[in-house]
């Protein structure tokens, strides 16, 4: 268990250096460039919107408009691609750095601080494909709990395990995400995911990026399907147009390129994310547009 615990600890403690730059349309004219951006370190195992209040507090002095709500109407973008708030930060990063990857190779040189640059935008109407954020922090928490209910149902055939948590444990579970308490979080999560006699299915999501959007698939992953139940067999079944012989695409989990021969059950056990799902990002070492049909 030592290696397993170390891998889990590393994924939980993984951080990203993020630069948030205001859309020029939101900025008071004449503001110096350094005042329209802020830098922060964000846990890979979190949601981007959890950090919106901090970002807006840092930048409110250069905004044309008053910040009436630290959540509603605000959204992140990267090179004209919507960055969804409702996926783990690390998964978004792993998926989106597949855009024009050759141009980004220089960012990963030794002794270089890699910064993920995002644009902060505002619009009254929700972007196509986005989940409207109208309920602030409570909506984020409710959404996260719903993900765990889904994951629990997939594993057990019901949501009894998570619904049976005491009120204090249920509150503590979310607080662990905010306060970064891995030990207590894992203890509660294991009570939800553990199943005697094996799982009914595995909660898995596959994230595939094009130059226009982030596409997410949620396949039904039952033990014993595709022969031995390997990652490669799943990807060839779900994305046959992408994973033919000689494909340059690579599956990445928590920033780690994983072997197609890996057993899905093992990957879930090691790399289940903070929302109860195993998130697989499809990345490419060369620039290309992934088919969407």
From Swiss-Prot:
Entry annotated with the keyword Protein transport: yes
Keyword match Protein transport: yes
A GO CC term assigned to this protein in UniProt: phagophore assembly site membrane
Complex and partners: Conjugated with ATG12.
Positions bearing the Glycyl lysine isopeptide (Lys-Gly) (interchain with G-Cter in ATG12) cross-link: 149
BP terms from Gene Ontology: aggrephagy; autophagosome assembly; cellular response to nitrogen starvation; cellular response to potassium ion starvation; cytoplasm to vacuole targeting by the Cvt pathway; mitophagy; piecemeal microautophagy of the nucleus
Membrane topology: Peripheral membrane protein
Localization, UniProt: Preautophagosomal structure membrane
Name of this chain's protein: Autophagy protein 5
Chain's role: Involved in cytoplasm to vacuole transport (Cvt) and autophagic vesicle formation. Autophagy is essential for maintenance of amino acid levels and protein synthesis under nitrogen starvation. Required for selective autophagic degradation of the nucleus (nucleophagy). Also required for mitophagy, which eliminates defective or superfluous mitochondria in order to fulfill cellular energy requirements and prevent excess ROS production.
GO molecular function: Atg8-family ligase activity; cargo receptor ligand activity; enzyme activator activity
Primary location class: membrane
Family: Belongs to the ATG5 family.
Keywords assigned by UniProt, alphabetized: Autophagy, Isopeptide bond, Membrane, Protein transport, Transport, Ubl conjugation
Family matches, as InterPro entries: Atg5 (IPR007239), ATG5_HBR (IPR048940), Atg5_HR (IPR042526), ATG5_UblA (IPR048939), Atg5_UblA_dom_sf (IPR042527), ATG5_UblB (IPR048318)
Organism, scientific name: Eremothecium gossypii (strain ATCC 10895 / CBS 109.51 / FGSC 9923 / NRRL Y-1056)
Record PTM: Conjugated to ATG12; which is essential for autophagy.
């Amino acid at each position: 268990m030592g290696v397993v615990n170390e891998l889990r600890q590393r994924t939980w403690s993984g951080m990203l250096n993020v630069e948030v730059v205001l859309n020029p349309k939101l900025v008071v004219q004449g503001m110096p460039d350094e005042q329209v951006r802020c830098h922060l370190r964000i846990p890979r195992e979190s949601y981007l919107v959890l950090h919106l209040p901090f970002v807006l507090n840092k930048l409110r002095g250069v905004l044309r408009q008053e910040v009436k709500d630290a959540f509603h109407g605000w959204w992140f973008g990267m090179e004209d691609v919507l960055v969804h708030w409702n996926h783990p930060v690390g998964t978004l990063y792993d998926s989106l750095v597949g855009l024009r990857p050759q141009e980004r190779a220089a960012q990963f040189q030794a002794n270089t601080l890699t910064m993920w640059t995002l644009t902060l935008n505002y619009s009254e109407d929700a972007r196509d494909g986005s989940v409207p954020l109208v309920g602030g922090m409570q909506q984020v928490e409710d959404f996260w709990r719903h993900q765990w209910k889904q994951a629990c149902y997939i594993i057990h055939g019901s949501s009894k395990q998570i619904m049976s948590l005491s009120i204090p444990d249920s509150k503590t579970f979310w607080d662990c995400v905010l306060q970064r308490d891995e030990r207590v979080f894992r203890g509660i999560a294991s009570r939800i995911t553990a199943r005697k006699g094996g799982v009914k299915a595995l909660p898995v999501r596959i994230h595939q990026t094009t130059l226009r959007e982030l596409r997410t698939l949620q396949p039904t992953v039952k033990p014993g399907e595709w022969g031995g139940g390997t990652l490669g067999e799943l990807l060839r079944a779900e994305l046959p147009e992408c994973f033919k012989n000689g494909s340059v695409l690579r599956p990445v989990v928590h920033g780690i390129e994983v072997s197609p021969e890996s057993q899905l059950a093992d990957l879930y056990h090691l790399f289940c994310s903070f929302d109860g799902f195993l998130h697989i990002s499809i990345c490419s070492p060369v620039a290309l547009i992934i088919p969407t049909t």
